Amino acid sequence: MRAYADTGFLCSLYASDAHTNRAVARIESQRLPLAFTWLHQLELRNALRLKIFRRESTREQSTASLNAVLADVAAGILMPAAPAPFDVSTEAERLSAQWSSKLGTRALDILHVAGALVLGVDEFLTFDTRQAALARAAGLRVPRLA
């Protein structure tokens, strides 16, 4: 497993938004599996369902997106990963203490970067500038998603 995408990136991949074309292009060009943790599962599924409440998608569109996620897990595009919770928590606290006051990072963003570090991935995919700054500060490669 060499890449980790934050949930915002994954949401753009599975539900049309301003970043969808860039997310799809990146995945098609890299052909690497993406780590898919319990945090991704909860956050992505909830985000896709929340789009119904916000009237950004229909129930049918959200169901299709959820089914596409399941299909990509089965196809190995999303690779189930289980970083040790204690290790993620320890790394997250370290990142928070070192960077939150400087970068303005949020707890879920910190958890994603900590999870990526614990999993030992090579690169971190995000459209979030603060999360990208944290990932870079933590030593992860964050490609420019143009």
Where does each model-flagged region fall?
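Short, well-structured N-terminal submotif of metal-dependent ribonuclease cores
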Residues: 1-43, 47-64, 129, 138-141
